[in-house]
């Protein structure tokens, strides 16, 4: 059973159109917006709030897409999420030198990446077995420029 709601997004059995029925890349901007509000935000908000209730007391589009998200048509990676080192060696160095990095890395790799991979119907990035199109750090974070 299909319904047409005012926003123009088709619903099947009351569920917004989205992965895996329609690939994220094939969705219209309106379908993506509806899916983000109906599926992604309600799934990710409690995950982030369980990790740090104070930091993520407010969880909305700006949390991940940044203050300029609307101006950028919500394209990722975000300008407001800190960039990550662009090599495994540089990342390992940060893990050793930055006290909060191990807990954030564990949270992102164990909670955020798997949840987003499932929501977008994408494999999760595994550095031991890279797969093209996998969901990983660079989907949300910019990578630092390579050192000269």
Show where each model-derived region lies.
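Sequence context surrounding c-type heme c attachment/ligation sites in exported
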Residues: 11-148
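Cleavable N-terminal signal peptides
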Residues: 1, 9-12
